[in-house]
From Swiss-Prot:
Keyword Isomerase carried by entry: no
Coiled coil spans: none
UniProt membrane topology term: Multi-pass membrane protein
Species, as recorded: Solanum tuberosum
One of the protein's GO biological processes: proton motive force-driven ATP synthesis
GO molecular function: ATP binding; lipid binding; proton transmembrane transporter activity
HAMAP family: ATP_synth_c_bact
Name recorded for this polypeptide: ATP synthase subunit 9, mitochondrial
UniProt-annotated site: Reversibly protonated during proton transport, residues: 57
GO CC annotations on file: mitochondrial membrane; proton-transporting ATP synthase complex; proton-transporting two-sector ATPase complex, proton-transporting domain
Cross-referenced PROSITE patterns: ATPASE_C
PANTHER family tied to this protein: ATP SYNTHASE LIPID-BINDING PROTEIN, MITOCHONDRIAL, ATPASE PROTEIN 9
InterPro entries reported for this sequence: ATP_synth_F0_csu, ATP_synth_F0_csu_DDCD_BS, ATP_synth_F0_csu_sf, ATPase_proteolipid_c-like_dom, F/V-ATP_Csub_sf
Length: 74
């Protein structure tokens, strides 16, 4: 019973990974659209895109860490 609840909790925690994947897709989609509109700002926009990617990926890593904590610690 407890093992099943742990698996369900870990599965629910990994749903955030799908949201992070969508967010990363939106970041780079916006980068492509912005560079297409103004190619002279490509280097500056790429830096902002990498920052957005890192922040979005950090949320995914926190969610993955929570899933592993649910599975192996609690």
């Amino acid at each position: 019973m407890l093992e099943g609840a742990k698996l369900m909790g870990a599965g629910a925690a990994t749903i955030a990974l799908a949201g992070a994947a969508i967010g990363i897709g939106n970041v780079f989609s916006s980068l492509i659209h912005s560079v297409a509109r103004n190619p002279s700002l490509a280097k500056q926009l790429f830096g902002y895109a990498i920052l957005g990617f890192a922040l979005t990926e950090a949320i995914a890593l926190f969610a993955l860490m929570m899933a592993f904590l649910i599975l192996f610690v609690f």
